[in-house]
Amino acid sequence: MKDMVFDELKQNMEKGLQALEKSFNKVRTGRASISLLDGIKADYYGTPTPLNQVATLSVPESRQILISPWDTSALNAIEKAIQKSDLGLVPNNDGKVIRISIPPLTEARRKELVKVVRKMAEECKVKLRNARRDANEEFKSMKKNNDISEDQMHDYQDQVQKMTDSYIEKSEDILVQKEKEIMEI
């Protein structure tokens, strides 16, 4: 029974960290990254289709993304989809491929992005703490039903706290790494 609670706790905490990393990937830094285009879908023959399913995406230079559609008739749809996105990217269509130059971030924008990623990290910590609370509630319920003793409950809660501290530390490490990436010129 306790193993199920710990497995669920670990699973929830892993999901929280993965969600944090995924949301960090969508934050634009000064570098070109294909993950910037993850949420963008082009209207391909009337169907909203992810860019990676209609074109080859690559990063030939540190500040440029190259989109080579398999079907050149999709060029305009891809270009429109990028312009509609709120990423502030300007696509350059040369008739065969689309190039997106990533402009360097201003100091003010960098500081703004750091605030955004800190908020995301704080939301992740809240998710981790909620998972901790749920696990502790499970153990209290088990104690109430006399499935475990008071001492066992406290031991399990200590283990839950250690696991929570470990995952919060991991989220801090991810945050520090992202802040460094954003502030890098």
Swiss-Prot record:
An example Gene Ontology biological process: translational termination
UniProt xrefs under InterPro entries: Ribosome_recyc_fac (IPR002661), Ribosome_recyc_fac_dom (IPR023584), RRF_sf (IPR036191)
Family under the similarity heading: Belongs to the RRF family.
GO cellular component entries: cytoplasm
Superkingdom to which the source organism belongs: Bacteria
Organism: Syntrophus aciditrophicus (strain SB)
GO molecular function: ribosomal large subunit binding
Role: Responsible for the release of ribosomes from messenger RNA at the termination of protein biosynthesis. May increase the efficiency of translation by recycling ribosomes from one round of translation to another.
Major localization class: cytoplasm
Name the UniProt record assigns to this protein: Ribosome-recycling factor
Pfam families: RRF (PF01765)
UniProt keyword list: Cytoplasm, Protein biosynthesis
Residue intervals passing through the bilayer: none
Subcellular location: Cytoplasm
